[in-house]
């Protein structure tokens, strides 16, 4: 019986251990003691806890098993669960009240055990539930000590960080460095010898030690190899930190260990900057003594002396000056240290600087002097100091602001008083003629204004646009200021140039109190703007109801007629301000008031579909039948616009649907014209006549047939419209449809009974018309049904028949003060752009008009108007209004934006039209300004005139251009070529040349054959124009007008093949004969060439060219080293004269002012330079002073020469440098100036990041840029700006946008005329809470501190909202991780394919991932817009097809030059380097999936430089950007450091930088040598007769390794993912594809199963890799390439490659197998590293056996790795060490793996395998192709060696494999 009980107890324990709950409960029901235990004291709870059976544990606890029962070793269930890492069990036990700090016999706590085994989750849970990590073992060791000893860094970091103040999350070594804990640091370094481990913020422990001035740990780190110059991504080195902290000993230590003294942060700060900014004089001195660069500049141009001045560090300033720092050194913004001191108010520093000679009047880039800044910042002591030391009180900024302007705007009354007392003028004006009073009024500073008025400031002072201070005050609504100004004599009725009074301004802004104050002072309501708007009009326009109410209460006239007779009610209706309409109507606003064209407010409401407004107007008596001048009613307009609801409303209010206008057009006619069927339905239902005729007899069916509206034709026919109705010309609807070529309508009309044989009044049938006009389809339809006998012969000319239409317009101007700018600068017939849209809706569709010589003149093919939607229009006008109404501000000078407008649609030819003896003219549809005028009686016969553009590269011989000449226009090809006209014709060509400095002229070149070019001459001048026009009604602008529009007029009697405009320097020419003569320059009158008799033997044309040399250009380039005379050239050059000719050239300015000597030849500083190079070659200057005699007279030098050439005088004291200086200067002088515009496109990729595309273009081809097709939005367009050919253009961003700099990417590009000069700038938003906008400036030079910058263009940009679709960025994200996905493309794979297949495979990947970027790539590969559009048209449905077509086209074009490197470069340039990395980088990364970033790979994030130009005065007065920076500190939450992106650090615990860690109460080490290790409890049960059938083996591989995946004991899943960048299954690519496609042969399956007994296990382990290959092989293009090479890849070894089949691999690889136990699982990880020429190739295969083994040994034998069954062991360390980025060499490092298993005696055996390359073999010349193997074993056979602390043996094996190469 006792035996049965023992069996039952054992069976119960076995059930508890295996988790068989039912069996265990049965035993308990049968009376088994729940607390029974085995021979080691383990009860059911212990066993279930160890195995992790949560349900069993919970049930046992419910059954009241004793929770705190201990084993013989003193372990509770919590100890055992913690040791085994069973976190769920740990939670249950703790929740049931288990003692978290219970100690076993030797003092081990559960926390100690979990820390020892690296169970991080258990450690975290125990700590959170009261575990005390300071409870030590009997030996005095804490959990931290054992975790340190075991090298569990994550656990160490958590233990150290837990419970500390703040949220410190630094890695363990950093904590040790912070606490100067050398002992802990030493142990940590023993476990991981890398001392340069990075924190989350990118700092090393040495950085931390430097910050906390911990010298001991710093020395330890340096001794252990810490990099003293380690540079994280932000560029901050330990020396920077030590210099900032001020620890002299630390700085000396770092310098002694080789710290680089010139190292710079990402913002270019040196250690000297840091020391100077914090006032550390001693450190500054040490650094200077070690050679620190005293003039080093930060990114913003700050030098150390600026830093010291900013920090008010007097001693530092003195020290730097003592070491010869430049006292007036300047930043990028040209701020000197004195500016900085003035900005910060540091009086003492300013005094020292001034005493040492600083210039008190130095000007910043925007013209601010230190005095301006002191006045702005209200530093009165600094201001007084500056004035005492000579600062100019009248100094002005770039925009003309004096210190008094600045102080007045900022409202600093004491400063204002002081300045006025010191003699500043109260009425001084800036460039916009604004006084300080304007400034004070605009900013609302009443006290300042009052004081200025007391000091004789003029209350009515007028600015440039006649704005007074009262306008400024009224605009901001500052009633107090308004009253003050009115009390001091300000006139309330003074108007600006646009006619606005202060009351208009207040009305616009809606400032009621301000308006009331003005009205009380008798402000006139009758004053009108230039467009006739009263204040009430303005209030009505902007919807200011309260203000309109106030004006009406003060007797405003509600029906005052303004411009074009518009009343306030018209304006309110036009702007849809319903509240204003409802206010005006009861107050007497008349709904009947007509505008000049008879439109009532109801007409406007009807046209704009404003239902509520229309109801209000009708309610107050508005007539639904009111007629305009042309008889148009509101119903006409609503019907034409297609507003069904409005039509129904008007008809319900007695509108007459049959009422025609003056031409008889009814609403139904207009509906038929536009095709609005629903409106036609409403009209018919209300009884409208379906066959109403116009004056010319057109019915609605005629109109619908003419305009091709087939649905309406059907509708009218359904409602019994007369299908054969005739017009007065006898045209039926069938005639109209035939004339317009509408085949479908012709067919429909015939089906509905239209007679095809009807003839018009001149006897024409529809068939005859169709034939005459060439409509083949219509002819075919009509031919069948028309009676041929009725087709009468007609004359050649067909008279077109057009229905009438409405052609009146109403200008309800969107802008009461200024003209809106359209595509033309001039206005057209006083029409407003918005209303031209309305006009276009009424006029016939010109693109449907058939050309015919019978019509004398046809208007433009494409009317050159700009259509702006009403809301856009209002916005545009508002911006324009801002400029006219704002008191002038620097923004209006510096911002170069103009309103973006849509470009017109382009047709094929620029011009193409027929002309006969009556003449005609045509404007270009694409180029504004292009026009061809053929006067009457010029053509002998009907002629088609064409005009098109020609690319220079298409010409046989482009126009020959000297270096100072350039093409000013596109090359124009006119047709017919060689046409001769009876009298002159006129061609006007737009050009883009700038007159530069006034020294250039335009020349027309012509070519008859494309090879020879000559100057075009015409004997007809401008005076002949009227005679040439021959009575033609064509307006020709004057030469002045053409010059403004940049149009060149050519008068010619024939058409050559080509015309082109050339820009060159002005020349004065004449014909010189044997009698001699002279030429004098008109540009520089002192320049003269004299030709004596017989210098030439026959009459020849000679020219004299004089090019002035501006002094400022010489100064800018050369300083005061030399001065120059004008350059004088006799053309043609290189001509020899029979007698010497005389030349006179003015002397250089410096020589004229102060002749240095009267010497001659080489002794004089005056040098004569000459270049005899002719033609188009570059000038080569030489000094001919020694061989030419100069005679001085009247400030000129005279000399003679036998050869025509270029001559130049230079006054250069360094005579040897004269030629060099001249060459430099000449290069700048010869650059051709052009007028170009900057256009900016933008797109946001997400909320913070976006892209800008900047264009600098001459002719307007914006709509052809690729950005139009890629969801970019135009955000800015500049006015025309002068740029020079070849000029580098540098872009600078400021404001809330920051450029993101990529490696080797510059934000600059060069201007080339007639090219799309393009620059891509990736940007990110600095502050997402503010508007994503800023300023983009273009400069001639990069922002260096020494350059005085001239800003070419300053654009205000706002990024468009992010429109995320299935865009490129989304698509790119789905590709990650690319290196893992495309391991198929690594070198190891490609090595087995042919070169062709390799290229094709790569091309396939490129085209698959190019997506929308293909168009960018096309641009980068220099494909034209036409090519890109053709690709787009030919492949409309697929991006893949478009990418494929592009790459094919590129390969065809490049031929042999199509190199992958070129393609990679292009991909990088368009920001698609991830594709290149995917293709190129996988081979390099084969040793490590996630390599450490190289320390040198810093991605600098550029901070914006301040530019000259501000959006408003407030911006101009803001602190300069260069002063807005924070100081370096690695641990404080400083903005300076926080912008750094975190680089991939070693995967430690999450880290943050914060406060100091207190570790004084935390015991780490005790006196013991090393911490004791806990051994696991023996859970084996004694043998019994009862079968062990209760055990339920759980072979879950994932579960087996889940506990190892957290620490250094990486699970297999991690391993496989880490090694699959370049790895594959044993058989490589082909076998992998075979597995994926189910095509592997049976033989292969058998081979594999020989070594893999459970293939499912392998698949689950390598699942990441399997999925990768599944995805890539699903890709059709890659699959296609791979399939072609599959035959080869399946049999690599036959071709002498290095791969082996599985059986060979098994034989050649090392393996240890234990075949004990009933079940065997193998996990196989194979690494193939690609063949590199001449290098050793490694092939490694690891077989890991997983077994079940029930240990039967003595009770005391326990597994050291407690908690893991022997069957569930895993490798203790990763299979391969990660290699640091900087350590990646050709020779792989050692790789160490450890494996543990239990031998037959129950001992724990540890096998350690060291794999390393023994040597490298140069296989390039190897003949022997046999495989070699070297195996070295270390250790005494396989006899176990005991390892201290563990029972077991260590087997060390080194294996390497080398192979020859065929």
Curated annotation (Swiss-Prot):
Identification of the protein by name: Ankyrin-1
Query: What are the boundaries of the region UPA domain?
Result: 1197-1331
Pfam families given in the database record: Ank, Ank_2, Ank_3, Death, UPA_2, ZU5
GO biological processes: erythrocyte development; inorganic cation transmembrane transport; multicellular organismal-level iron ion homeostasis; porphyrin-containing compound biosynthetic process; signal transduction
* Native source organism of the sequence: Mus musculus
Indicate yes or no for the key word Cytoplasm: yes
What's said on domains?
The 55 kDa regulatory domain is involved in regulating binding of SPTB/spectrin (beta chain) and SLC4A1/erythrocyte membrane protein band 3.
Segment 89 kDa domain: which positions? 1-827
Is Protein biosynthesis a UniProt keyword of this protein? Answer: no
Tell me the residues on which Phosphotyrosine occurs.
1069
Give the span(s) annotated as 55 kDa regulatory domain: 1387-1862
